[in-house]
């Protein structure tokens, strides 16, 4: 049985009723009414709850008749051939080129209509990742994004659906969970893993150009970093940049900023910015503080 607060926070019929089957909806409606009807319930929110239940119940019956159904946090995409892609997500947030959706095992980036070149670049850069040998591939590929779908949508937008292990979390969410700053020992291993990623990017001849709290995911149990987002900015070192997030632009080397050429130094400076954003700087050892504020 849902709590009063859960019922009041329901936005779609599928948030309240477990099925689009009419008999199930009727049975669940009666069960809720037995618990929250103002004539028999002592809950102070009973009137408000039943008003919400009645509203969603009426909407549910209409949707069932029309063959439709609604559930919150459900992403429905349709490609240009008419094929539907449906999935539930845990978190939605905007990024500079569109909307992102995080689910248990995927992260989906939906690009606005006018950002096709960024969508194309992300797909190309991810597919073009290379490794010196099998050992390097086994070590590094588990941290790199893997494309499940790259879609041109029927509404003119573009969509990348990437694989995401279930035990990884957005780095900005981890920061929020810790109240704005992580314990020093966690910042230390995060910086170590980010530095390893920069070494790999340098080997492959690219700069990621989008390493931020919103584009990096971490697996706390395995002490690993996965740069799943931001690949739309990646570019061969020395080639013309497509752009960078505003936070990265603020700390870019002057040369890279003026020449607008991709440079691994941008990634190195981005990792230090992440370290500063995650830290209570005053609690860090002096050498670590000096490193985070040094120039690469």
Where are these regions (language model features)?
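Juxta-kinase regulatory segment immediately upstream of eukaryotic protein kinase catalytic domains
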Residues: 66-88
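ATP-binding glycine-rich loop module of kinase domains
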Residues: 92-146
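Conserved structural core of kinase catalytic domains
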Residues: 144-185
């Amino acid at each position: 049985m849902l709590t009063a607060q859960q019922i009041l926070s329901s936005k779609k019929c599928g948030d309240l009723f477990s099925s689009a089957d009419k008999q199930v909806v009727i049975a669940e409606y009666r069960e809720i009414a037995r618990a929250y009807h103002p004539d028999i319930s002592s809950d102070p929110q009973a009137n408000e709850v039943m008003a919400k239940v009645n509203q969603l119940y009426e909407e549910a019956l209409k949707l069932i008749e029309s063959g439709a159904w609604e559930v919150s946090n459900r992403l429905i995409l349709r490609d240009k051939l008419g094929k539907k892609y449906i999935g539930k997500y845990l978190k939605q947030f905007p990024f500079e080129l569109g909307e992102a959706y995080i689910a248990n095992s995927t992260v989906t980036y939906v690009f606005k209509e006018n950002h096709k070149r960024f969508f194309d670049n992300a797909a190309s850069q991810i597919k073009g990742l290379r490794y010196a040998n099998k050992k390097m591939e086994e070590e590094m590929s588990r941290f790199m994004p893997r494309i499940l779908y790259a879609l041109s949508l029927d509404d003119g937008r573009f969509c990348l659906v990437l694989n995401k292990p279930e035990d990884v979390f957005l780095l900005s969410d981890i920061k929020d969970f810790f109240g704005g700053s992580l314990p020093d020992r966690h910042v230390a291993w995060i910086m170590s893993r980010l530095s390893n990623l920069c070494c790999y990017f340098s080997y492959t001849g690219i700069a990621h150009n989008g390493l931020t709290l919103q584009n990096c995911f971490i697996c706390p149990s395995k002490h690993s970093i996965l740069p799943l987002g931001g690949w739309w900015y990646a570019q061969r070192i020395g080639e013309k940049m497509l752009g960078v997030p505003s936070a990265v632009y603020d700390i870019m080397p002057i040369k890279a900023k003026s020449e607008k050429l991709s440079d691994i130094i941008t990634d190195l400076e981005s990792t230090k910015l992440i370290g500063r954003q995650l830290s209570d700087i005053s609690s860090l050892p002096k050498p670590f503080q000096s490193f985070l504020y040094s120039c690469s």
